[in-house]
Amino acid sequence: MEPDLHDQQQQQRVHSVVIITLPPSDDPSQGKTISAFTLTDHDYPLEIPPEDNPNPSFQPDPLHRNQQSRLLFSDLSMNSPRLVLGLLGISLLAVAFYASVFPNSVQMFRVSPDERNRDDDDNLRETASFVFPVYHKLRAREFHERILEEDLGLENENFVESMDLELVNPVKVNDVLSTSAGSIDSSTTIFPVGGNVYPDGLYYTRILVGKPEDGQYYHLDIDTGSELTWIQCDAPCTSCAKGANQLYKPRKDNLVRSSEAFCVEVQRNQLTEHCENCHQCDYEIEYADHSYSMGVLTKDKFHLKLHNGSLAESDIVFGCGYDQQGLLLNTLLKTDGILGLSRAKISLPSQLASRGIISNVVGHCLASDLNGEGYIFMGSDLVPSHGMTWVPMLHDSRLDAYQMQVTKMSYGQGMLSLDGENGRVGKVLFDTGSSYTYFPNQAYSQLVTSLQEVSGLELTRDDSDETLPICWRAKTNFPFSSLSDVKKFFRPITLQIGSKWLIISRKLLIQPEDYLIISNKGNVCLGILDGSSVHDGSTIILGDISMRGHLIVYDNVKRRIGWMKSDCVRPREIDHNVPFFQG
């Protein structure tokens, strides 16, 4: 007598396999997949009673499929309870591990795809991101050729024609905000710029300013420590350097009146009294080296390329600098002014954010090698979703700079003093406007003492080299060609942020190549200077030299600062099929 189907199922021994596949670490948005299989010891065919009235077009009710699944799981649970518990335990551990590694992706699993796509579309319509690539400083002819070939993809004879096409049909900001989410997300932006730590001592980007019919490109020194963007102008000019481009010519109807909010913002820290009835808004900014810029506030259109290649324009308030004095004039031989990127309301990112064009997030990535490229961006789209080290941003009502708190600082295994409150807590200020890094006096003296050990190796002090205060030459008198020749003699500097317990703190590691340079004489020089007379004298100023080779992000929305190691060739979030840098 043949056993019926129920008896067969009772006699079969059921096995199960559960496969959990996690997404790749570089693309957690693909989600996880869970596959379950059941196997039996005997090959009994599954017999399904025929329907009385079969209908070929009939689609099975999802409820029936769920009941079938519950039946199979019920049979399995009755026959192999230990196996079920074991599989459930493994599944829970896998899900918990995934949630800890990719919390954002797990949160995305909780909403439907339609809701998630709708939210993404809304967010993309609200803000966009701008990217400003940073290249090594080139000679004028090479720089001009790279602009033509890389940014415009054209030969020299087509340069004028391409500029006309680019300026005649700009996309208004309002049009950009109504652009489809897909086009914004797939676009890129490239502005040819130049700079290095040594010998130029600055990094700058190129921005188009003015109306479409008479717009002019200006090279601006990127400065996260400055609030005001300003350009040398003919108002007329009292003291101006030659600059990289012709002087900006302001229009009278573009001048900012003293009664406007931005004027009050700029003049709040100035010694001169605010004049509400004046027809113009005067400014005077003094920098750490005691050089200064004086001028008036004006307003004009800034043109910024979005990811999709379209050109957005927005009216931006900036300074028309007609009187520059001090060492500032030296940098203005290569640039036309300063691009203020601080937290201040009048900074460029803050103005764009107040108009809803971007999220108030600024990031920069300066490559480590001498011929390196890099970029800066405004907006949150290019902030990596993982791999960043984040620390709280210090809030200082008196200073709109990007600062964090540091609890320990060391050179190798030796501790360096912090000149903060009671010497226990110090502050670090991120400043792309400083070529080099500055330590408080006590920490600097301790570092110099610790570095005396390198003179006993293959190096000896060379006081004849005036590139920087401290330089060493090889005892063989053979000039060094790169930092790879000498970095083995030096030790890393570690900044510990947060708790003093190492296991729960964050660290910023400054490798020897992040604080040394090779001078024109072939010597190695210390790129950390005495900061006794810089800022308040007790703050660590992190300059360009120590930020190279890192992506550093200032998130003013979440009030945090983050960093990660990077080659700075291109933003991680930009599609590799989209040209970003050439050559």
Swiss-Prot record:
GO terms for biological process: defense response to fungus; proteolysis. It is found in: Membrane. It holds the Pfam family TAXi_C. The active site is at residues 223, 431. Interacts with BAG6 and BAGP1. Involved in proteolytic processing of BAG6 and plant basal immunity. This is Aspartyl protease APCB1. The lineage of its organism: Eukaryota, Viridiplantae, Streptophyta, Embryophyta, Tracheophyta.
